[in-house]
From Swiss-Prot:
Domain of life: Archaea
SUPFAM superfamilies assigned: Zn-binding ribosomal proteins
Cofactor(s) essential for the protein: Zn(2+)
GO BP, sorted A to Z: translation
Matching HAMAP family: Ribosomal_eS31
Homology family: Belongs to the eukaryotic ribosomal protein eS31 family.
Gene name in the database record: rps27ae
Co-factor remark: Binds 1 zinc ion per subunit.
Annotated positions binding Zn(2+): 21, 24, 39, 42
Name of the protein in its database record: Small ribosomal subunit protein eS31
Keywords from the UniProt entry: Metal-binding, Ribonucleoprotein, Ribosomal protein, Zinc, Zinc-finger
Lineage: Archaea, Methanobacteriati, Methanobacteriota, Stenosarchaea group, Methanomicrobia
Length: 49
């Protein structure tokens, strides 16, 4: 998946479609799995409810 797919542009505004990793900071996105969000860089995982 290309980085351009992580953002959505509507008119003059840009919105992020994926969350940043809270450990790694801005620029490192969390992968969206069926039951969790995971960082491929540091291994951080958040389970969905």
């Amino acid at each position: 998946m290309a980085v351009k797919d992580y953002y959505k542009v509507q008119g003059d505004s840009v919105t992020r479609l994926k969350q940043f990793c809270p450990r790694c900071g801005p620029g490192v996105f969390l992968a969206d799995h069926k039951n969790r969000l995971a960082c491929g860089k540091c291994g951080y995982t958040e389970f969905k409810k």
